[in-house]
Curated annotation (Swiss-Prot):
Keyword Ribosomal protein: yes
Annotated keywords: Ribonucleoprotein, Ribosomal protein
One MF term in the entry's GO annotations: RNA binding
GO cellular component: cytosolic small ribosomal subunit
The protein, known as: Small ribosomal subunit protein uS9
Family assignment from sequence similarity: Belongs to the universal ribosomal protein uS9 family.
Family annotation (Pfam families): Ribosomal_S9
Superkingdom assignment: Bacteria
């Protein structure tokens, strides 16, 4: 741990998170707010903390995050991906447990585009025979 801070970029759906890890007491700041203030849902908070709990680093780093785009779920996933990438910068040996849990792989599922002649991506307009 020679560097003062470790950086990771995470993406999920249309959200992009930039994450900085700094050795500290475990304070997580998202867009200048605490984690509890930023995310109302408990599931989003749990998703953000998953890589830290898995690697037993929950109280060891102060985490500063800037996240933009998407909704709560996408932003939480982007932060999780960013924290994972930053943890890999801290210690490359953490790659095996994080990869096994599926945190290293970027979730590439994004919104399907709307097609012309259709109501949405797949739903057609109501069809009438007569």
């Amino acid at each position: 741990m020679a560097a003062a801070s470790f950086y990771g970029t995470g993406k999920r759906k249309s959200s992009i998170a930039r994450v900085w890890l700094k050795p500290g007491t475990g304070v997580i700041t998202v867009n200048h707010k605490t984690l509890d203030e930023y995310f109302g849902r408990e599931t989003s908070k749990m998703v953000v903390k998953q890589p830290l709990e898995l690697t037993e680093n929950l109280g060891k780093f102060d985490i500063y995050v800037t996240v933009s785009g998407g909704g709560d779920s996408g932003q939480a996933g982007a932060i999780k991906h960013g924290i994972t990438k930053a943890l890999l910068e801290v210690d490359a040996a953490l790659r095996t447990p994080l990869k096994k849990a599926g945190f290293v792989t970027r979730d590439s599922r994004i919104k399907e585009r709307k097609k012309y002649g259709k109501k949405s991506a797949r739903a057609s307009f109501q069809f009438s025979k007569r």
